[in-house]
From Swiss-Prot:
PROSITE patterns tied to this protein: RIBOSOMAL_S10
Name of this chain's protein: Small ribosomal subunit protein uS10
Organism: Mycoplasma mycoides subsp. mycoides SC (strain CCUG 32753 / NCTC 10114 / PG1)
Keyword vocabulary terms for this entry: Ribonucleoprotein, Ribosomal protein
NCBIfam families: PRK00596.1, rpsJ_bact
Function: Involved in the binding of tRNA to the ribosomes.
Transmembrane is among the record's keywords: no
Taxon lineage: Bacteria, Bacillati, Mycoplasmatota, Mollicutes, Mycoplasmataceae
Similarity section: Belongs to the universal ribosomal protein uS10 family.
Pfam families on file: Ribosomal_S10
Keyword presence, Isomerase: no
GO annotation terms (biological process): translation
Length: 102
């Protein structure tokens, strides 16, 4: 018997908010009786932006800023209709992007 699974990928700039969201999703999914595998930490994307400090000259004086995107993967095995309904109603913070694949 092939088991169905739902993959939930969360992204965010603050790892603490992403981890809190994962805990909310796990509690909601386990409340419906579904098995949860994860959270699996995925590689963190790091984007570095370099700008000149001076307006006109002094090219040797630069400043770097970085932006990190933290990602987590969660698998829910054999999700039911109740599991999907509960996951639609979970309130997540505004700094978290969620992607669900069946």
């Amino acid at each position: 018997m092939a088991e169905s699974k739902m993959r939930i990928k969360l992204k965010g700039y603050d790892h603490a908010i992403v981890d809190q969201s994962i805990v909310k999703i796990i509690q909601a999914a386990e409340g419906t009786g579904a098995k949860v595998r994860g959270p699996i930490p995925l590689p963190t994307e790091k984007q570095v932006i370099t700008i000149l400090r001076a307006v006109h000259k002094y090219k040797d004086s630069r400043e770097q800023f970085d932006m990190r995107t933290h990602k987590r993967l969660l698998e829910i095995l054999n999700p039911t209709a109740a599991t999907m309904d509960i996951l639609k109603r979970v309130q997540l913070p505004s700094g978290v992007d969620i992607e669900i694949k069946l």
